[in-house]
């Protein structure tokens, strides 16, 4: 069986990649616009939440700490990525690697306990148990 690679310079490969990516994004947008539900008489100034119209207008900013939960997720998700890399090399790391991983997990657990006691994980502020 012969060689299946084609000689191509990096600029052409980048151009092909960008063109294909833009084409896929454009196709997704066109298909989504074509498949979406057409709503006649819809008011664009009313927020749409689960198909239910709001009972009363919003009075001020919504207290939803999505960004805080997302940031905490990213921080603690990095723990999984780092520990996966450690698990791949666990045999080569030996006991010292195991101790380092245990210290790493311990520090992250202390950070989680601190955030929990500080109330950073409470969705509604002021409702302590």
Swiss-Prot record:
Task: List the catalysed reactions.
Answer: a quinone + NADH + 5 H(+)(in) = a quinol + NAD(+) + 4 H(+)(out)
* Membrane topology summary: Multi-pass membrane protein
Q: Which residues cross the membrane?
A: 14-34, 67-87, 95-115
Write down the Pfam families for this protein, in alphabetical order.
Answer: Oxidored_q4
Q: Where in the cell is it found?
A: Cell inner membrane
Sorted alphabetically, which keywords does the UniProt record give? Answer: Cell inner membrane, Cell membrane, Membrane, NAD, Quinone, Translocase, Transmembrane, Transmembrane helix, Transport, Ubiquinone
Q: Any idea which GO molecular function terms this record carries?
A: NADH dehydrogenase (ubiquinone) activity; NADH:ubiquinone reductase (non-electrogenic) activity; quinone binding
- Which EC numbers does the record give? 7.1.1.-
The record's annotation in Gene3D superfamilies points to: NADH:ubiquinone/plastoquinone oxidoreductase, chain 3
Q: What is its main location?
A: membrane
Q: Which GO terms describe its cellular component?
A: NADH dehydrogenase complex; plasma membrane
- Which top EC class is named for this enzyme in its record? translocase
Any idea what job this protein has?
A: NDH-1 shuttles electrons from NADH, via FMN and iron-sulfur (Fe-S) centers, to quinones in the respiratory chain. The immediate electron acceptor for the enzyme in this species is believed to be ubiquinone. Couples the redox reaction to proton translocation (for every two electrons transferred, four hydrogen ions are translocated across the cytoplasmic membrane), and thus conserves the redox energy in a proton gradient.
The record, for PANTHER family, names: NADH-QUINONE OXIDOREDUCTASE SUBUNIT A, NADH-UBIQUINONE OXIDOREDUCTASE CHAIN 3
Subunit notes for this chain? NDH-1 is composed of 14 different subunits. Subunits NuoA, H, J, K, L, M, N constitute the membrane sector of the complex.
Q: Which family does it belong to?
A: Belongs to the complex I subunit 3 family.
Q: Name the chain's protein.
A: NADH-quinone oxidoreductase subunit A
Q: Which organism is it from?
A: Rhodopseudomonas palustris (strain TIE-1)
């Amino acid at each position: 069986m012969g060689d299946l690679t084609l000689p191509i310079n990096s600029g052409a490969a980048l151009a092909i990649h960008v063109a294909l990516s833009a084409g896929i994004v454009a196709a997704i947008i066109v298909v989504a616009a074509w498949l979406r539900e057409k709503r006649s008489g819809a008011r664009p100034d009313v927020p749409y939440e689960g198909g239910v119209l709001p009972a009363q207008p919003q009075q001020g900013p919504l207290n939803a700490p999505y960004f805080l939960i997302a940031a905490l997720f990213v921080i603690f998700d990095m723990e999984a990525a780092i520990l996966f890399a450690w698990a791949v090399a666990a045999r080569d790391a030996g006991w010292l690697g195991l101790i380092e991983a245990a210290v790493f997990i311990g520090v992250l657990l202390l950070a989680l306990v601190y955030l929990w006691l500080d109330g950073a994980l409470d969705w509604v502020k002021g409702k302590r148990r």
